[in-house]
C-alpha cells in the first residue's frame, strides 16, 4: 500500500538548534513537494521515501493556485487518471482477482461501478437523460461490483472511459451554480455539489484500487 507523508516547509534555517519556542524555525505550511530551494531535514531519506510515486505516472498535475472550477475539475481528472494507471498492464484474469480477502472487490468490479456512477450522476440525474443503466438490473443490482464470468475487462474499461468523456462534456456545458433535481433526491443540487460528490467517490475507490493492485502484483505508488 502506498502512503504519502507530508513534511513541514520551514521559513528559517534547516533544523539545527531549537529556537526559543522549542522548535526548529516557523512552519509555514505542510507540503508533499518541497518548494524550490527549500532545505530538507538531514534524515538521509530521498523524495521517493517521503512520497513513492507510480513508476510510469503521467497524470495531469493539479495546480496549486487555481480558480474554483479549475481546481475541482483538476482533482476529479487526477482521480480518474489514477484509476487508469492502476489498470495498466493487467490481464483480464488479474483484473478479476479478489486480491484482498475477505473483500470481494476486484479492479474489474470497481471500473464497472465507476462507469455506472458517471452515467448515473451526470447523465441520468443532472441532465435527466433517458439512458439505460449500466451493469445494473432490478434482479441483479450488484452486476457492477460482481462481473459475470463472460464480462470483458477491456470492453468495460472502454465503457468507463466513454462515460468519462460524456461527463466532461456535461460539466463543460454548465456553470457550477446550475441546479438539478436528482431522480432519487428530494433536494436540489448544483453542479458544484455533484463534482465534489464525484471527487469523494473516486477518492474512496482509488484507495480500493491501490490495495487491489498491490495484492495482484506488488506494484505500489501514490
Regions from the PLM with identified roles:
Residues 2, 12-15:
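Short linear motifs in low-complexity or flexible loops
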Residues 142-178, 192-198:
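Acidic/histidine-rich alpha-helical segments that form the ligand environment
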Residues 30-55, 59-61, 69-142, 182-222:
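Short, contiguous alpha-helical
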